[in-house]
């Protein structure tokens, strides 16, 4: 199961991070 979340990057811009839920 994969889900993506929006997190703040080091530059302050939102980045998509993919996490694997096994």
Swiss-Prot record:
Reaction(s) this enzyme catalyzes, per UniProt: Hydrolysis of proteins and small molecule substrates at -Asn-|-Xaa- bonds
Domain of life per record: Eukaryota
Pfam families documented for this protein: Peptidase_C13 (PF01650)
The EC number(s) this enzyme carries: 3.4.22.34
Entry keywords, A to Z: Hydrolase, Protease, Thiol protease
UniProt-listed InterPro entries: Peptidase_C13
GO process annotations (BP): proteolysis
Transmembrane stretches, start-end: none
Molecular-function annotations in GO: cysteine-type endopeptidase activity
UniProt family annotation: Belongs to the peptidase C13 family.
Entry protein name: Hemoglobinase-like protein 2
């Amino acid at each position: 199961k994969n889900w993506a979340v929006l997190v703040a990057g080091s530059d302050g811009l939102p980045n998509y991070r993919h996490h694997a839920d096994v």
